[in-house]
Amino acid sequence: VPAAINSYINYTKAYALFAIKVFCNATQPQTEGAMRPITIKAREGSFFNPKFPAPSGGRAILQIRIFDTINGAMSKALPKKAMGAFSHWSNPNIGGIDDKTSKPFVMYDLSLAGYGGRYGEDGPEALTPVMNCTNIPVEVHETHNPIRVKCLELLPDTGGAGQWRGGCG
């Protein structure tokens, strides 16, 4: 696609393997032998295997979408291992000119939200989706940017209803 959200095949394979591993044995070491039985293919020139120089910058967004797609498909065969969809991304990007220094600034953060519920338990709250990152503490933003955070809290009832609800964010 013309937007910077294409998933080159190396990312498509990595994200798909992650999703499949969650269903098989998430604690098994990530080795070539463990992944060898899995084949991942995508038509060349497609969204999941674009031709260079197709733009691809939104890889974090893709990871969650690919995971949710495979999770949804696998849930038909293994419903007790599946989970509800992630909250996806809503990252604030704030920028401008600092009134005190007259210098430009850009502030970026990860908005933490809930994971989907799964068989037997509610989804966890206020986590980043599946990629080993975290938000930047409020104190860091306030120290390095001309902003003031008035409130940072979990919003009740935002995780989606169900026997096992999604986590709030």
Stretches found by the model and what they are:
Residues 1-168:
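Glycine/proline-enriched, intrinsically flexible loops and inter-domain linkers
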